[in-house]
């Protein structure tokens, strides 16, 4: 039965291999994120930003990039497909991490952090869209395993960050190593990604597009109250998470005055708890 389903969906590879390939993309995203989070105090010291307000403005460019990418991600995934966008977004995410390590002034750092936020959200949308397609292939829910893999990779990334700090490796070489590792992962796993399967016929899609006209006014429509409520809950959840990742290391170092190598054991503990 599974072989028939694979043939129907046009899959040339075993579904287990497809699943593990998709898992590797989630692992790459988690590794990229925690690599940045583990070196935030070092990057701050490199640019000698002594005022928390100014540093907060710099870090704020990441969520700004994520916000800008919300409509962009949906459009690109719908037009290009999640298969292409998953590859582009993960490679772009790794490239943005590498660029952060090369920044030689605070303005370039801000630009790279903005791009980091954009590709972060592109990864979220495209990878989860691919995951939904693989769930259809399996006929059951497996998304939790992908998200668990993300957390496991984030934990591993924090451990690597700990080793890099103890060894005196600069953020540039740290980020370069991670970017190369992610690039190899994408090149190896990309062929197993699946094309999006249309859930509507072409005629139904054309009819839906006609109903959505005029497109210029469609974004003005009032959202449902449930959507607003969920958005508010998500906003506060992200505020707490951002405070944890962006500022805890600085708090441990500047207030509690513990070594950098020790300050990021809390990040590994937090990621382990998520997993």
Give the ranges of each region predicted by the language model.
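Helix-breaking motifs and short loop linkers at transmembrane-helix boundaries and internal kinks
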Residues: 102-104
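Pair of pore-lining "gating" transmembrane helices in MFS-fold secondary transporters
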Residues: 15-35, 227-240
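Conserved MFS/SLC helix-loop-helix module at the cytosolic interface between two early adjacent transmembrane helices
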Residues: 71-92, 97
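Conserved small/polar residues in nucleotide/adenosyl-binding loops
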Residues: 265-274
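Short amphipathic helix-loop junctions that connect adjacent transmembrane helices
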Residues: 38-52, 247-261
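Helix-loop-helix hairpin linking two adjacent transmembrane segments in secondary transporters
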Residues: 150-194
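Cytoplasmic helix-loop-helix junction between adjacent transmembrane helices
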Residues: 116-146
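Central cavity-lining transmembrane alpha-helices of secondary-active solute carriers
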Residues: 60-73
């Amino acid at each position: 039965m599974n072989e028939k389903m694979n043939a129907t969906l046009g899959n040339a590879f075993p579904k287990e291999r497809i699943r593990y390939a998709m898992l590797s993309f989630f692992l790459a995203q988690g590794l990229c994120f925690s690599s940045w989070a583990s070196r935030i105090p070092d990057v701050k010291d490199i640019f000698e930003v002594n005022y928390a307000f100014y540093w907060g403005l710099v870090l704020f460019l990441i969520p700004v990039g994520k916000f800008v990418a919300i409509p962009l991600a949906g459009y690109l995934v719908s037009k290009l497909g999640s298969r292409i966008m998953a590859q582009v977004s993960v490679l772009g995410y790794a490239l943005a991490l590498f660029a952060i390590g090369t920044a030689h002034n605070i303005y370039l750092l801000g630009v790279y952090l903005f791009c980091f936020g954009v590709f972060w959200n592109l990864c979220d949308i495209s990878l989860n869209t691919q995951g939904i397609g693989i769930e259809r292939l399996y006929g059951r829910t497996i998304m939790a395993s992908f998200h668990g893999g993300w957390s496991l990779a984030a934990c591993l990334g924090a451990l690597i960050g700990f080793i890099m700090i103890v060894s005196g490796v600069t953020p540039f070489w740290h980020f370069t190593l991670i970017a190369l590792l992610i690039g190899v992962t994408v090149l190896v796993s990309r062929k197993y990604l699946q094309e999006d399967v249309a859930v509507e016929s072409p005629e139904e899609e054309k009819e839906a597009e006609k109903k959505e006209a005029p497109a210029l006014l469609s974004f003005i429509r009032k959202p449902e109250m449930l959507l607003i409520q969920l958005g508010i809950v998500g906003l506060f959840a992200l505020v707490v998470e951002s405070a944890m990742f962006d500022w805890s290391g600085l708090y441990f170092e500047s207030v509690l005055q513990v070594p950098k190598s020790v300050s990021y054991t809390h990040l590994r503990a937090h990621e382990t708890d998520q997993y």
